[in-house]
């Protein structure tokens, strides 16, 4: 029986289907693990909402758009600054410079809905706010407008408002209809983001110039500078990133994604949709890529190189970068060999990272989990796990406590909400959603992650955790 | 001079808000109950954003459950979610108190929360047995997100807790109810420290100090489930009906004192945060008045040490420097009064709320300090940003949400309030009371020295 | 790895010293006695430079008298000056204790200080009456400036105080003698706090916490003459012969414990400053051992809060960063051990003394931390400056005397020790004990964030 | 009887002669007040030693010399950084730039004398140290060597050593023989400094260029930038400061003071000696000047202007500066009118400031005192005081307490050692030796001082000093 009902779940036995223990004797090597379903109420999930999925993950990384959240003040407040760490540079594709650096981290607009808006509808207020916002930040290249629970429930028609305002303001005004309650997780928001951008933006603008080596880099959000790492590799290979979706991107880039020669899909959970749609409509093929860990990174650079006939350049990059990191990799492996790890990312990172962490750091992956991963993702986790590894969809805090007890991970890669909880159990935790001292992607990023894992495990605090009643022998006596 | 110039928002839009919605205040309040568990009746974002925020600020876990409303609830109502949510939480966590916190969705859907809670109680009793079920108290807290802000949510929560749980007895307990407001663990510890120096036992309504700043001691921790240490015990909450009086240290938290006063004829006093000398003096006098206890030499010596620090550094380094203060309506007003006590000019005070107590409290500060104060009222950080571009100041005081603005403006930021996530330890350091004032004197002065004196470093030779 | 590389001074010259001469340590020690008055037997500069230094660091008055030796004393000796100085001081200030602190001049002149004190006693008795005169104790403290440094002067003073004043009784007093070393008021308060959490009463030898951090309360102050509040009462000093044991928290202050041990068969322990977790643990264990009192949950919870802070921030922000530490031989060694507990590398530790305990304590740190440490031994700030130009570090930890050097090197300075005059409040913030460690975690982390994270400010978003 | 025995002095009746109460009915208008005598042992003086007088006051302000203190480590440590605040700029008179900014605040050298040196003498060690120092800082233009109590008592011959080292090193090496015990106060050190500089340096070098308007500015140490204020005025008048003695000065400037057309003596206590000697030997006349307070500043700029035929320029400077400060002066006067003040400077500032503080700030000078002032200074204090003012030579702390009680000053201008003592008595105190937010000289400096006095008195802490048991009426009830 590959499924597992944890002791803490005896009152919510539905959870059994979400928790799988890898057993390679399974006929198909994997097993349909339940996922992407609604969380059981009251079970202390780590999941977020659809609004977080679209604004927090997809659109919040764009440098030159203004976000208008149609909501009571709370959603706007929570949408500000982004919960991830998405830096942007002010440089624009046409060589100009956007007037505010990290604009995406600095400003957000909301309609501040109150009781009477709830009663009488908020569409007029929304229009007014969009006008004001446009006046306040006239230099933005587009305005994105977000539905929330409140406006979803009162039934405001955001598309109609945005259409009207786009005509009035002469710049793109785009509605994202992903109210918080939509879908079981933030993944619904990713989905809405993808479709909206495809339907309303892709194909509507032309790039200032194109080359034969233009790519879309899709699902790369520049968390803590991830994109800037990859950018260097592509530059070295002579490949031009025409459009990012959406890390350090401009609004314009989204509009001319149809002009690339190839799409690369980096985060396959949040962004495959848009790549597929672009392929279907515009014939731009896409590759699913993985740049986490030296081997995947090398493999995928090779694949891209091959596609563009840049095999030599790819090899050169790989060689150069590997040489740089090898000594550090060796050091961290010597320190981390055999240490038990639980990777609890949002989704894909749990399977991106499991092999590289085993291979390059010698660590023992004892548990994997995802917050909003879908079936294909769990298949990959299952495939990549060794026998006995526990794989959990949407783990709740009580389950986490039990897993720590039973599997005794020596480190957990997780989110900030769980981090301090694990600490209280005496287990170090490194933030895998937005990193500690990232970036974590690419060759050097993997070393950064290794270092963060290393420092977390070797933090002397863990050894000093409990007061010793007896003076240690080699002490100051 | 000494005018309060109230500048209201002219925009409809809110840009870079400095308030958030009601549920946060309620989640904060319930987190201060020992084995207390907030259950947010809404979408997952409603709890997750707040847990994220608490984790980031306190660097501690924040256990907040959610009923995970989805499309089906939007159509059929949240009955099933709330009842099963309460049931699951009760069975798996065995909390002492569950606080049901509503949101925009559950309020718009129009759920009969009171009715659902009744049903849930029955089901819990069926499952866990009458006795076990009776030990678990459920508090209904209505916090519609589209009305006011987190401070109102806090006020609603404290009132709901008191109204639901208080159990009058025939005798007074000799204690004092204290409503601290949305403050930091360090502040609550300072309140308790002051009370102990006055020989007074307090009932904190509620006490987030330990839950949001807990020791890392796995060997001693509550496990299966893990609970953070501390919080106000249920027994104390029940006993709050029998106290000598109620002091609210947040000008927005006046409903519970009023309710206690009305029901139990208990004297109460509501003020802005006791930040600085005069506000703390006033708090001490109220404690004395309600309890009859003397003001001890010990506490006056602590006061004397702040006065000493102020005498030594305020006129020399701080006098006449202009300050912008933003955030919480109670803390900002307290801070404004205190920076005036330091001889600084609280040039502009910005809050996101629109309540009159903010204006009234600030008028007093303007009068005392003999300075004109601009009050950005019901405003946001963007309004402050625009204001400061035209009217530069020497120092900003407020949360980390103003950090990038401060950096762009070239104005040093002294971090106060919630949230502070770009530096460490601020949650532990009080700003309330005499020791809080001492921290502020040191922190503000060092910020000024860093920025304005290091350029002529010989000046720091003595 | 884990070698201690001792680098001794090659120059004869001292350039930018980090030690000063013995009398300062003695003046500090006597200042910690209630109504205790140091009388420096030397030139006016000997007291004035120190009073200047204390005023600048503590921002408090420091009453230190001087015998004002001049040319005539150089020729005829300082007899008249010392006898009349003691007489005037006694008559006008009515102190409980006068500590006669010698200097280079009085030592070179060869004054018979013991004899002069005897004569002075007779004259005081003549003037004030036998009874009044007997109440005023005189302690002779020999502190030749050309031997060692202020730490030796402190050690000599504590020994002289104990040897002169201690009065054995038949029964133990159940107390613990604590020699804090040359530390700050905040440190001594933290020591007293820890003892109180352990239910132990301490006799501080001596207690400068109140004298060097006194409330400004003219209405309650001792006047005519004004005395700063506090200090160890004479009765306690007399009672120190009857304690359960003596703990010295400064590795250089070992003479008084040895003397007490020898005379009264009292157990003693001498260690480096209890900075950081292991050193504080060790202190707590010694308290337990000497008193038999249990280690309470309260103190372990305070410990757990530091551990929590270290778990949260050390690996994330501090790990692997190189640190240069300079100053006091006991504090630097404690700091080195603590920064290693934070995962940082105490790359270089510099002190002006040449005592072996410094080297031995540091060897232990090197071994524990598995890092090579360079020990600048018997060195000065110039040596550190030259070293750091070749071997840059990420952080400097030490007194304000390194501030201009740090600025020129572009290395942030976290201020610790004596003197700190270019920022405020450091004298009140402990570095000792668990709460001291907590302050240090916060302070060091924020210094690192300021310098190395603000340039990529998005990293501070969570 | 103009002398006064304070109550606290009944055990040291000699003090009566040091304390004078102004009485204009005195035949001569003033009275020989005892001063510049040895302090009574054990009476808690604020005075320093002769070493402090020479290094701390006179020589420590020079930008390009290295100081070698022949002492146990303490004197060297205390001599580091200077107790005053003497900034220097790296610009040199010949247009070059000294390699270290504020060099004078950063480095000091000592011989670190130990027991065996005391027994066997320290002269060889001193030589060795001077050689090392010269090697460590080869760019310095001179080395100044200081005797201290120890070396004074053991009888080391510093002049001999310096002579030898000067020959060996090829740069000026100068001995200053002012051991700590010399003379009753730091004033002895000033004296030694003056004579030594005159005898060993003045006349030994020639300036890079001269003009017809060259002056020596003597006794101006650039405390907190004082000199830089005056420099502007002289520049505006077309007058060239050829040599400063010694604020922001170079060693060379001291050596060519004989080439100026006029010496101005700013601090008349510490530096008149050298001006007199230069006049006697080289015929350079000197003027005693006073730039504290607008009126003295104007008067003395006029006198200098007159000397050089620059009356018009002087008037222009005065007019411009007065216009700038008048509104602020008016404001501070309105705030400080009638407030009682005690001026307790080292010496001259007590008489420099008494009149301007009365005239421009309307304050009531109730007490004056000096630490190391001589007879001529007390004469001036007496002349300038109104009847009833108490004038104290070398006040000790008990006397200070009594004066506060009896004269109730609302502010004391004093030193840092006394500052916090006065605070504890509830009386604000501003540091007059090295200032709080200086400079205090000249027109704008006077306003700075007025502001510091104003902020000190109006510091709200004083009103909040005592806890009120009753809630004030207009409060938050």
From Swiss-Prot, chains A, D:
InterPro entries named in the record: Nase/OxRdtase_comp1, Nase_asu, Nase_comp1_asu, Nase_comp1_CS
Catalytic reactions on record: N2 + 8 reduced [2Fe-2S]-[ferredoxin] + 16 ATP + 16 H2O = H2 + 8 oxidized [2Fe-2S]-[ferredoxin] + 2 NH4(+) + 16 ADP + 16 phosphate + 6 H(+)
Domain of life: Archaea
Function: This molybdenum-iron protein is part of the nitrogenase complex that catalyzes the key enzymatic reactions in nitrogen fixation.
GO molecular function, one term: ATP binding
Pfam families listed in its UniProt record: Oxidored_nitro
Organism per entry: Methanococcus maripaludis (strain DSM 14266 / JCM 13030 / NBRC 101832 / S2 / LL)
Chain residues that bind [7Fe-Mo-9S-C-homocitryl] cluster: 267, 433
GO BP, sorted A to Z: nitrogen fixation
Gene name tied to this protein: nifD
Subunit relationships: Tetramer of two alpha and two beta chains. Forms complex with the iron protein (nitrogenase component 2).
Cofactor note: Binds 1 [8Fe-7S] cluster per heterodimer. Binds 1 [7Fe-Mo-9S-C-homocitryl] cluster per subunit.
Family: Belongs to the NifD/NifK/NifE/NifN family.
Protein name per Swiss-Prot or TrEMBL: Nitrogenase molybdenum-iron protein alpha chain
Keyword terms: ATP-binding, Iron, Iron-sulfur, Metal-binding, Molybdenum, Nitrogen fixation, Nucleotide-binding, Oxidoreductase
Binding site for [8Fe-7S] cluster: 49, 75, 149
Cofactor(s) required for function per UniProt: [8Fe-7S] cluster; [7Fe-Mo-9S-C-homocitryl] cluster
Record-listed E.C. numbers: 1.18.6.1
Enzyme class: oxidoreductase
From Swiss-Prot, chains B, C:
UniProt keyword annotation of Endoplasmic reticulum present: no
Broad EC category: oxidoreductase
Positions of [8Fe-7S] cluster binding: 21, 46, 104, 145
Gene3D superfamilies xref list: Nitrogenase molybdenum iron protein domain, Nitrogenase Molybdenum-iron Protein, subunit B, domain 4
The reaction(s) this protein catalyses: N2 + 8 reduced [2Fe-2S]-[ferredoxin] + 16 ATP + 16 H2O = H2 + 8 oxidized [2Fe-2S]-[ferredoxin] + 2 NH4(+) + 16 ADP + 16 phosphate + 6 H(+)
UniProt keyword list: ATP-binding, Iron, Iron-sulfur, Metal-binding, Nitrogen fixation, Nucleotide-binding, Oxidoreductase
InterPro entries, A to Z: ChlB/BchB/BchZ (IPR050152), Nase/OxRdtase_comp1 (IPR000510), Nase_comp1_CS (IPR000318)
EC identifiers of the protein: 1.18.6.1
UniProt cofactor note: Binds 1 [8Fe-7S] cluster per heterodimer.
UniProt entry tagged with the keyword Metal-binding: yes
Obligatory cofactor(s): [8Fe-7S] cluster
GO terms of biological process kind: nitrogen fixation
Molecular function per GO: ATP binding; iron-sulfur cluster binding; metal ion binding; nitrogenase activity
Family as reported in the entry's similarity comment: Belongs to the NifD/NifK/NifE/NifN family.
Role this protein plays: This molybdenum-iron protein is part of the nitrogenase complex that catalyzes the key enzymatic reactions in nitrogen fixation.
Subunit: Tetramer of two alpha and two beta chains. Forms complex with the iron protein (nitrogenase component 2).
Protein name from the UniProt record: Nitrogenase molybdenum-iron protein beta chain
Gene: nifK
């Amino acid at each position: 029986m590959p499924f597992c009902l944890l002791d803490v779940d005896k009152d919510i036995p539905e959870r059994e289907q979400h928790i799988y223990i890898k057993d390679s004797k399974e006929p198909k090597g994997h097993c349909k693990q339940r996922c992407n379903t609604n969380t059981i109420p009251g079970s202390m999930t780590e999941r977020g909402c659809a609004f977080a999925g679209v604004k927090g993950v997809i659109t919040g990384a764009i440098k030159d758009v203004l976000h208008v959240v149609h909501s009571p003040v709370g959603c706007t407040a929570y949408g500000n600054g982004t919960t991830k760490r998405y830096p942007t540079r002010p440089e624009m594709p046409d060589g100009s410079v956007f007037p505010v650096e990290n604009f995406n981290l600095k400003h957000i607009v909301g309609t501040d809905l109150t009781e009477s808006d709830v009663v009488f509808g908020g569409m007029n207020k929304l229009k007014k706010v969009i006008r004001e916002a446009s006046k306040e930040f006239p230099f933005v290249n587009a305005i994105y407008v977000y539905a929330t629970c409140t406006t979803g429930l009162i039934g405001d028609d955001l598309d109609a408002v945005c259409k009207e305002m786009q005509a009035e303001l002469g710049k793109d005004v785009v509605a994202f209809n992903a109210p918080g309650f939509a879908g079981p997780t933030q993944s619904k928001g990713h989905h809405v983001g993808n479709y909206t951008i495809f339907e309303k933006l892709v194909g509507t603008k032309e790039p200032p110039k194109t080359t034969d080596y233009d790519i879309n880099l899709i699902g790369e959000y520049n968390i803590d500078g991830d994109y800037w790492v990859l950018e260097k590799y592509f530059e070295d290979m002579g490949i031009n990133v025409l459009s990012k979706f959406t890390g350090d991107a401009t609004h314009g880039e989204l509009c001319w994604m149809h002009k690339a020669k190839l799409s690369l899909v980096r985060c396959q959970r949040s962004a495959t949709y848009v790549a597929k749609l672009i392929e279907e409509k515009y014939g731009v093929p896409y590759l699913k890529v993985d740049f986490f860990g030296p081997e995947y990174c090398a493999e995928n650079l090779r694949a891209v190189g091959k596609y563009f006939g840049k095999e030599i350049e790819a090899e050169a990059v790989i060689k150069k970068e590997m040489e740089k990191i090898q000594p550090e990799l060796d050091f961290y492996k010597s320190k981390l060999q055999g240490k038990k790890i639980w990777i609890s990312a949002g989704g894909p990172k749990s399977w991106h990272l499991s092999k590289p962490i085993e291979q390059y750091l010698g660590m023992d992956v004892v548990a994997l989990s995802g917050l909003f991963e879908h079936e294909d993702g769990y298949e990959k986790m299952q495939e990549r796990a060794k026998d006995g590894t526990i794989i959990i969809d949407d783990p709740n805090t009580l389950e986490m406590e039990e897993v720590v007890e039973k599997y005794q991970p020596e480190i957990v890669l997780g989110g900030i909400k769980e981090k301090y909880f694990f600490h209280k159990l005496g287990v170090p935790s490194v933030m895998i959603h937005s990193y500690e001292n990232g970036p974590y992607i690419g060759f050097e990023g993997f070393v950064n992650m290794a270092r963060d894992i290393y420092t977390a495990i070797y933090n002397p605090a863990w050894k000093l955790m409990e007061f010793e009643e007896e003076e240690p022998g080699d002490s100051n006596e | 001079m000494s005018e309060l110039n109230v500048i209201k928002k002219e925009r409809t839009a809110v840009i870079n808000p400095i308030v958030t919605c009601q549920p946060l205040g309620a989640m904060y309040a319930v987190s201060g109950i020992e084995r207390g568990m907030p259950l947010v009746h809404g979408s997952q974002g409603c709890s997750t954003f707040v847990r994220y925020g608490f984790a980031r600020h306190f660097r501690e876990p924040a256990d907040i459950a959610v009923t995970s409303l989805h499309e089906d609830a939007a159509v059929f109502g949240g009955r099933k979610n709330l009842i099963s949510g309460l049931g699951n939480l009760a069975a798996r966590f065995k909390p002492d108190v569950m606080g049901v916190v509503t949101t925009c969705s559950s309020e718009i859907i129009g759920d009969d929360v009171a009715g659902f809670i009744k049903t849930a109680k029955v089901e819990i009793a069926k499952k866990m047995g009458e006795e076990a079920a009776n030990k678990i108290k459920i508090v209904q807290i209505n916090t519609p997100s589209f009305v006011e802000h987190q401070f109102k949510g806090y006020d609603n929560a404290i009132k709901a807790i008191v109204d639901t749980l208080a159990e009058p007895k025939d005798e007074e307990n000799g204690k004092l109810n204290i409503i601290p407001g949305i403050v930091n663990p360090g502040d609550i510890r300072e309140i308790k420290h002051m009370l102990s120096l006055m020989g007074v036992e307090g009932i904190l309504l509620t006490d987030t100090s330990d839950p949001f700043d807990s020791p890392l001691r796995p060997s001693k921790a509550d496990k299966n489930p893990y609970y953070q240490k501390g919080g106000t015990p249920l027994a104390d909450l029940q006993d709050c009906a029998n106290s000598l009086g109620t002091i609210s240290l947040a000008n927005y938290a006046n409903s519970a004192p009023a309710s206690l006063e009305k029901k139990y004829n208990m004297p109460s006093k509501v003020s802005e945060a006791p930040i600085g000398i005069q506000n703390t003096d006033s708090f001490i006098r109220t404690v004395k008045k309600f309890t009859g206890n003397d003001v001890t030499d010990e506490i006056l010596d602590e006061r004397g040490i702040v006065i000493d620090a102020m005498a030594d550094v305020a006129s020399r380094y701080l006098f006449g420097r202009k300050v912008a203060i933003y955030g919480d309506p109670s803390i900002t007003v307290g801070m404004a009064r205190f920076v005036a006590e330091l001889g600084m000019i609280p040039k502009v005070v910005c809050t996101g709320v629109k309540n009159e107590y903010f204006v009234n409290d600030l008028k007093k500060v303007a009068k005392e300090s003999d300075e004109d104060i601009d009050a950005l009222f019901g405003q946001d950080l963007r309004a402050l940003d625009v204001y400061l571009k035209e009217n530069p100041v020497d120092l900003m005081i407020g949360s980390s949400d103003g950090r990038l603005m401060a950096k762009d403006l070239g104005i040093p930021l002294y971090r106060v309030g919630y949230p502070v996530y770009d530096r460490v330890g601020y949650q532990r350091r009080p700003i309330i009371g005499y020791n809080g004032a001492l921290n502020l004197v040191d922190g503000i002065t060092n910020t000024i020295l860093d920025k304005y004196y290091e350029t002529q470093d010989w000046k720091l030779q003595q």
